[in-house]
Amino acid sequence: MLLLGILTLAFAGRTAGGSEPEREVVVPIRLDPDINGRRYYWRGPEDSGDQGLIFQITAFQEDFYLHLTPDAQFLAPAFSTEHLGVPLQGLTGGSSDLRRCFYSGDVNAEPDSFAAVSLCGGLRGAFGYRGAEYVISPLPNASAPAAQRNSQGAHLLQRRGVPGGPSGDPTSRCGVASGWNPAILRALDPYKPRRAGFGESRSRRRSGRAKRFVSIPRYVETLVVADESMVKFHGADLEHYLLTLLATAARLYRHPSILNPINIVVVKVLLLRDRDSGPKVTGNAALTLRNFCAWQKKLNKVSDKHPEYWDTAILFTRQDLCGATTCDTLGMADVGTMCDPKRSCSVIEDDGLPSAFTTAHELGHVFNMPHDNVKVCEEVFGKLRANHMMSPTLIQIDRANPWSACSAAIITDFLDSGHGDCLLDQPSKPISLPEDLPGASYTLSQQCELAFGVGSKPCPYMQYCTKLWCTGKAKGQMVCQTRHFPWADGTSCGEGKLCLKGACVERHNLNKHRVDGSWAKWDPYGPCSRTCGGGVQLARRQCTNPTPANGGKYCEGVRVKYRSCNLEPCPSSASGKSFREEQCEAFNGYNHSTNRLTLAVAWVPKYSGVSPRDKCKLICRANGTGYFYVLAPKVVDGTLCSPDSTSVCVQGKCIKAGCDGNLGSKKRFDKCGVCGGDNKSCKKVTGLFTKPMHGYNFVVAIPAGASSIDIRQRGYKGLIGDDNYLALKNSQGKYLLNGHFVVSAVERDLVVKGSLLRYSGTGTAVESLQASRPILEPLTVEVLSVGKMTPPRVRYSFYLPKEPREDKSSHPKDPRGPSVLHNSVLSLSNQVEQPDDRPPARWVAGSWGPCSASCGSGLQKRAVDCRGSAGQRTVPACDAAHRPVETQACGEPCPTWELSAWSPCSKSCGRGFQRRSLKCVGHGGRLLARDQCNLHRKPQELDFCVLRPC
């Protein structure tokens, strides 16, 4: 009756997307030369030393030959296990023998096969062969003491296959949302098909990938933590079980389909014997992840050079984890957090040996990989099959290509962008540590108990090696249930056969060796990214000569090279607009779907406040506002990184180039602004201003063509706020900086017809305005003096081109040496202006009256008279065109509210609140009482927030 119920419900419980799994009892045969083909039950790692081993497993009408060697790659030299909390009965510390348990290899000499097994306590682990996965584990009495063992060494082999067609749309088993973020968009941008539009006359986009273009081995130093529920469930076998999972995950990351040499290295295992020893674990996956991340951060070492420092941490628990909408969640991690000590972590719900795939999946998220079904992936690569590692359902894995093209592209971009630099430090020395197939260690019954709890048994009539169906109870009746994973690799599926990659395979072709990858020849250079003005061409090579196989190393070294092309200036460059300006202008009229901007918005490049890492993004500001956005993840190749730099952007990375536009060139502008010049084609102009009047004072007029401009205003007695501020006007008299009695306290970049001037802001003891390249428009420098009228000290210098045929005899040398004139008089090092005779009458201005406003926009007046040489008033005698102004704007800036960032939300779900602090800040950064700021315009200090529904 019980059997009938199982049969009925096994068919009723079948889900779309795959047939029932298969299983078979097998007896592994060791075929080493010293064994001579007899049936042999593995006693332990001491039997072989460091020699290779060969096992034959016959199952599912096939022979599987596992050619195994010790594998040391997934355990660090300083690997250790630590127990925290009160010891549990029956649990002992890890044995050093575990270091020699794990082996890896291949199956039947298939290029895409793999084997990862443990040889301690029986043959247990997993292997993959011809698209199927196999899990092998000893039957219960097979791991008994030697005197009680089954003389035949019986093992259970399970297999599951790769789906041949659509698999339906099962619920996602991952707690990470299948959305996209700007980093994913940036990573996939090079793959996107280009449409006709902006830049075709001046640029042509290329297809391809890579930024830093170098394939470098990465070592992911990993902390593995098991909570109290894991300790109670697995007992003394826990450490071996965890390492079996990590061994399989490490093998997946060494597969060449990921296109990068990545090594998962375990540096420490922590076993938590009681709840108080570790982080708080609940059914809320997001909260558990947050608790674990904070907990592991406190335990980690400060220095990355410490042998027990970890780059990422993984928590395993038997707690049923729930995501935002379902409790089918098997894991959760924050996306793109590798090398972030506070957030590089993941949480895994243990459901048996398939947790190895969940581990690899969640680590993929930490490496910034999204799910394969995100819209951006599908737009670039088409609809991807649901049998890759980053499928949200994670039901079937294509062992021939476990990583999709989208995942490989994104992790490559992530590493090339510098986000994985903490992974470059290599463990101090290699240790020969084994790697095994999980099916060699765990029977089919044990796999069911690991997945569904004590007492769960394999369902009868399963198809070998495909989905693992196990018994359970629902509403008092016996049912068959599955988590859509196959039998563990290495599970026996017939005489001379075992499960591998979900299929039952035979053993043959034993002498299969590891193949390291090697670079193929360089492809030809692609098209130039621009038709003029300096573009870039790329050439790449692939790791296909040969492709890595059987756990071999991925290629190391430069994978993409580049060169400059089409360096002749563009005809439209006379307009003075830079190529970056044109790229921003292409978005004019696009209001970014926000009501802050109108459809008439005009976009200009943003330079100030942009971090060096973001210089090759197209960051544009809405002209006349403070709003700015990333309008494109990368500028067109060949765009200057900044107006005062000769470096250019290549695939989103700033690459050094010469002033001639050639990548790798060492040519530089001299102080005259001449590319490759010798500093002899210009003359230096210097000056000093020290005696101002209240308001704006003329300092110097800088002609067009001036270069190496350096203007400095040193604060009175070293003070930061001495009430003297540099100001700048263009040739039309429009203020470009600190006009109308409004000054900038922060650093700013001013772009004037393509030339960049860097302003230090007023918050420094030495206020400066500098430009290295020649300016294309005459500018006027002034100094604004207010307040206590402390004397300014403005020094300026710049270089002007020499006259082509300058007659030095017409300018006799001043016996006093180079002239340095003061107070608003332009001076040349080889020329002195003679003062004009004083006219008989001149304008005389009185002192300024009080300001009409205490702060903000006020006015003040003064008397202006025309007086003769004797001081009498002679109104008609003065030139009206030179009459001084009688009225001017005045008033210091009013105190303003200074805001801090919002605090985190007080609740992880549901309605919470967040705060921020307010300060009333006066002119010069002085902290004032709140009532001195406009209370009617006081920003909000407290607000409600909802991170997600509970």
From Swiss-Prot:
Q: Which GO terms describe its molecular function?
A: endopeptidase activity; extracellular matrix binding; heparin binding; metalloendopeptidase activity; zinc ion binding
Protein name (Swiss-Prot/TrEMBL): A disintegrin and metalloproteinase with thrombospondin motifs 15
For the region Disordered, what residue ranges are annotated? 151-172, 798-822
Could you tell me where the Basic and acidic residues compositional bias lies? 802-816
Q: Which SUPFAM superfamilies does this entry report, sorted A to Z?
A: Metalloproteases ('zincins'), catalytic domain, TSP-1 type 1 repeat
Identify the residue span(s) of motif Cysteine switch: 172-179
Q: Where do the segments described as Spacer lie?
A: 701-838
Q: Which PROSITE patterns match?
A: ADAM_MEPRO (PS50215), TSP1 (PS50092), ZINC_PROTEASE (PS00142)
Q: Which residues form the signal peptide?
A: 1-17
| Top-level division of the source organism's lineage | Eukaryota
Q: Which residues form a coiled coil?
A: none
What is its subcellular localisation? Secreted, Extracellular space, Extracellular matrix; Cell surface
Main location (coarse class): secreted
Q: In which tissues is it expressed?
A: Expressed in fetal liver and kidney, but not in any of the adult tissues examined.
Cofactor names from the entry are: Zn(2+)
Cross-referenced InterPro entries, in alphabetical order? ADAM_Cys-rich (IPR006586), ADAMTS/ADAMTS-like (IPR013273), ADAMTS_ADAMTS-like (IPR050439), ADAMTS_CR_2 (IPR041645), ADAMTS_CR_3 (IPR045371), ADAMTS_spacer1 (IPR010294), MetalloPept_cat_dom_sf (IPR024079), Pept_M12B_ADAM-TS8 (IPR013277)
Instruction: Give binding positions for Zn(2+).
Output: 174, 361, 365, 371
Q: Which UniProt keywords apply?
A: Cleavage on pair of basic residues, Disease variant, Disulfide bond, Extracellular matrix, Glycoprotein, Hydrolase, Metal-binding, Metalloprotease, Protease, Repeat, Secreted, Signal, Zinc, Zymogen
- EC number(s) from the headed UniProt entry: 3.4.24.-
Q: Where is the Disintegrin domain?
A: 428-515
Gene name as annotated: ADAMTS15
Domain writeup: The spacer domain and the TSP type-1 domains are important for a tight interaction with the extracellular matrix.
Please report the PTM annotation for this entry: The precursor is cleaved by a furin endopeptidase.
Q: Report the active site residues.
A: 362
User: Pfam families in the record, alphabetically?
Assistant: ADAMTS_CR_2 (PF17771), ADAMTS_CR_3 (PF19236), ADAMTS_spacer1 (PF05986), Pep_M12B_propep (PF01562), Reprolysin (PF01421), TSP1_ADAMTS (PF19030), TSP_1 (PF00090)
